[in-house]
Regions:
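Acidic, Ser/Thr/Pro-enriched low-complexity segments and adjacent helix/loop capping patches
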Residues: 1-219
Length: 219
């Protein structure tokens, strides 16, 4: 059975996150909640010493005075403010900046070596669409793992084993894609199998997928 994970919660004003959801963890959880709403939502993230991020989910865009090249990996605080949005009155000046690179950056740094709290243990995940990551650096291991998730369901540990990369890196990547809201999950998909034992995927062996991804990212 294939599902899109979902959790609907109400809106809330600017608040301090509980300790377990401090920093980007609280922001990532708020992003996920907004993505599950049946009506448009906007989100404002007050990042300590780094101004305010304004996100309009209906427009799939955000505003922020900070370049993603200077993304703060561990800000002292991130205060969260959610508000109802409107399709007729965007909360930011459009076209804004593409949302995928921001959510990718938040997801990579939100939960450390733990999975995002809405990911279900034992379930496998696969891409619903390719990410759009033209504003952020993506290394070859990440490209490999994204390509794998574009073609099969896998857990983070299975992904790490197949890509021969540290499990922490695979968990962070799955978290980033989960915060972007582009994963679907399956309780019954078969275990992911690598192309061969003890073989690290090579660029030449996955050229088609890499080219498609890099073309999608504008690289």
């Amino acid at each position: 059975m294939v599902l899109d994970s979902g959790l609907a919660v109400g809106t809330r004003p600017t608040v301090d996150a509980p300790p377990e959801l401090a920093g980007w963890a609280g922001a990532a959880s708020a992003v996920h909640a907004c993505q599950q709403m049946a009506f448009p939502m906007t989100l404002r993230l007050h990042v300590a010493a780094h101004d305010v991020i304004a996100i309009d989910f209906a427009s799939n865009a955000f505003e922020w005075s900070v370049s993603l090249d200077d993304f703060p990996q561990a800000p002292e605080t991130v205060l969260v403010e959610t508000r109802p949005g409107s399709l007729d009155a965007p909360a930011i000046e459009l076209p804004g900046r593409s949302l995928d690179p921001l959510l990718w950056s938040i997801g990579l740094h939100a939960f450390g070596d733990e999975p995002a709290p809405w990911l279900v243990p034992g379930h496998r995940y696969r891409l619903r669409r390719w990410p759009s990551l033209s504003e952020v650096p993506v290394n070859l291991d990440q490209v490999r793992m994204i390509a794998m998730l574009g073609n099969a369901f896998a857990t983070a540990d299975e992904l790490a084993a197949a890509a021969q990369t540290p499990p922490l890196d695979a968990r962070r990547l799955v978290n980033a894609l989960a915060v972007m809201g582009i994963l679907r999950r399956s309780a019954g998909a078969p275990a992911f199998e690598a192309a061969g034992p003890h073989r690290r995927p090579t660029a030449s062996g996955t050229t088609g997928l890499f080219n498609r991804l890099r073309e999608r990212w504008g690289r």
